[in-house]
Swiss-Prot record:
Cellular component annotations (GO), alphabetically ordered: plasma membrane-derived thylakoid membrane
Enzyme class: translocase
Magnesium recorded as keyword: no
Functional summary from the UniProt entry: NDH-1 shuttles electrons from an unknown electron donor, via FMN and iron-sulfur (Fe-S) centers, to quinones in the respiratory and/or the photosynthetic chain. The immediate electron acceptor for the enzyme in this species is believed to be plastoquinone. Couples the redox reaction to proton translocation, and thus conserves the redox energy in a proton gradient. Cyanobacterial NDH-1 also plays a role in inorganic carbon-concentration.
Organism: Parasynechococcus marenigrum (strain WH8102)
Keyword Transport: yes
PANTHER family in UniProt: NAD(P)H-QUINONE OXIDOREDUCTASE SUBUNIT M, CHLOROPLASTIC
Keyword terms: Membrane, NAD, NADP, Plastoquinone, Quinone, Thylakoid, Translocase, Transport
Descriptive protein name: NAD(P)H-quinone oxidoreductase subunit M
Gene: ndhM
Length: 115
């Protein structure tokens, strides 16, 4: 698999079986790279990024020893996407008002006026 790059792409999460080397993805059989919110739809605090990275690490550790496949990457990506939605609904994450597109892909913002 050293020459094969597996990837999973969801709306806000991209996973690659690769490492970043001089801004390039280099396929790697024993490393996963997480690209979080590539379209900058959300405003991320360091604490929230850390929570998502910790969840990512938990998912990777839970799958350790298993087959690394498109399916296993999709499961991790889908779980992270759901976790991001939970953070948004809990008010820990917010939409970026300066984002390229305002499509509210995970539902309308939760503000006191709308609750």
């Amino acid at each position: 698999m050293a020459d094969t790059l597996l990837k999973c792409t969801t709306r806000h999460v991209r996973l690659f079986t690769a490492r970043v080397d001089n801004q390039d993805l280099v396929p790697s059989a024993d490393e996963l790279t997480l690209d979080l919110d590539p379209d900058n739809e959300f405003l991320w605090s360091d604490a929230v990024v850390s929570k998502v990275q910790q969840r990512f690490q938990q998912l990777v550790e839970a799958g350790a020893g298993g087959e690394l496949s498109d399916y296993s990457l999709r499961r991790i990506g889908t779980d992270l996407e759901g976790y991001i939605r939970q953070l948004l609904q809990a008010g820990e994450l917010s939409y970026n008002p300066d984002g390229r597109v305002q499509n509210f892909s995970m539902g309308l913002p939760r503000t006191p006026d709308l609750l």
